[in-house]
């Protein structure tokens, strides 16, 4: 399999597993944070060295490639199950934070209603 095809498949896999984390915070383009920017789609010649691969994947400075290359390298040996577990943990944390915000808003509304009820009682 040519390296370009390998990286294309790897990119798809990482994007699918990482979900929201596969969107670069700097440029908002899906796929960057998994270490595989869209530039890789244009690669048709297999690269022989890691440096060649790096240049094919990150041909432009504005793609914040160094950061994403390091992230990709750090994820390279992580199993799919581990990535799925991380994704589920992030989803749980997001849901918990959302629930806590709603709970706080409800507490504030209850306190406001309680205050209004006290004022109404004092007028009677």
Curated annotation (Swiss-Prot):
Any one GO BP annotation for this protein: symbiont-mediated suppression of host innate immune response
Record's keyword terms, sorted: Coiled coil, Host cell junction, Host endoplasmic reticulum, Host-virus interaction, Inhibition of host innate immune response by virus, Metal-binding, Phosphoprotein, Suppressor of RNA silencing, Viral immunoevasion, Zinc
Chain residue ranges for the region called C-2: 30-68
Primary subcellular site in the record, as a coarse category: host cell
Cysteines engaged in disulfide bonds, as pairs: none
Subcellular location: Host chloroplast envelope; Host endoplasmic reticulum; Host cell junction, Host plasmodesma
Record PTM: Phosphorylated at Ser-79 by a host PKA-like kinase; the phosphorylation at this site seems to suppress host cell death.
Tagged with keyword Iron-sulfur: no
InterPro entries: Viral_P18
GO cellular component terms, semicolon-separated: host cell endoplasmic reticulum; host cell plasmodesma
Chain ranges passing through the membrane: none
Region described as Basic motif (BM): 1-14
Top-level lineage group: Viruses
Residues with PTM Phosphoserine: 79
GO molecular function list: metal ion binding
Coiled coil (residue ranges): 72-124
Functional note: Suppressor of RNA-mediated gene silencing, also known as post-transcriptional gene silencing (PTGS), a mechanism of plant viral defense that limits the accumulation of viral RNAs. Promotes viral cell-to-cell long distance movement.
Record note on quaternary structure: Homooligomer.
Similarity section: Belongs to the virgaviridae suppressor of RNA silencing family.
Domain description: The domains BM and C2 are involved in zinc-binding. Zinc-binding of each of the motifs is critical for the biological activity. The coiled coil domain is probably involved in homooligomerization.
Name of protein: Suppressor of RNA silencing
Organism: Peanut clump virus (isolate 87/TGTA2)
Lineage, opening ranks: Viruses, Riboviria, Orthornavirae, Kitrinoviricota, Alsuviricetes
């Amino acid at each position: 399999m040519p390296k370009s095809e390998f990286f294309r498949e790897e990119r798809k896999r990482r994007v699918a597993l990482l979900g929201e984390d596969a969107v670069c915070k700097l440029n908002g383009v899906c796929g960057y944070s998994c270490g595989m920017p869209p530039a890789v789609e244009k690669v048709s010649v297999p690269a022989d060295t890691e440096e060649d691969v790096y240049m094919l994947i990150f041909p432009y400075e504005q793609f914040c490639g160094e950061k994403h290359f390091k992230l990709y390298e750090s994820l390279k040996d992580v199993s799919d199950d581990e990535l799925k577990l991380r994704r589920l943990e992030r989803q749980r944390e997001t849901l918990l934070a959302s629930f806590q915000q709603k709970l706080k808003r409800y507490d504030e509304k209850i306190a406001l209603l309680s205050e209004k009820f006290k004022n109404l009682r004092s007028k009677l």
